[in-house]
Amino acid sequence: YKLMKKAGFRFVLFGLESANQETLDRINKGEKIETMIESCKMAQKAGLSVHVTIMFGYPWEGEKEIENTVALGRELLKKGYAKTLQATVCIPYPGTPLYKECLENCWLQTEDYSEYDMRRPIMKTPVGDDRLMEAVQSVYKVAFSPEFIARRIVGIRSWEDVKFIGRAAGKVFGHLLDFKNS
């Protein structure tokens, strides 16, 4: 990561997807959770802005697995290992192994592709749609914690940083509304 920084990179995105090794194995991620967390730490230490993505709504994940993923997302943000995070619901896109598995197991709630926009669960899960949406929202709410806000303020180095934080705050509010339970 130091070489990336030296070469002019400023940003790196890690698709963590889940904090559960079984899920990572089932979706053929090819990584261990510990390795991904360590990568976030090393990239941040090298001076790169780390963005992390996580997803909720895998058909085999229950409450424990959801809590693990929420906790990991919040921890990465609170400790500053990730500067930003995106949490969404998992979408089984046609043609993927996950989509095929959904068809084989009758896990799809809809085949209306206009609804495959990551704003609502598409797959049946053990915990229900409302709980998944609550999990997505709970990760975004860490942006309102005193530690996270203080770290962002201390990290301001330029007017560009101020504008970025303003845009990011707007997006957080937007995502909270996107995933608000009806």
What name fits each language-model region?
Residues 144-182:
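Membrane-proximal basic amphipathic "stem/tether" segments
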Residues 1-160:
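A structural motif corresponding to the C-terminal lobe/cap of the Radical SAM core domain
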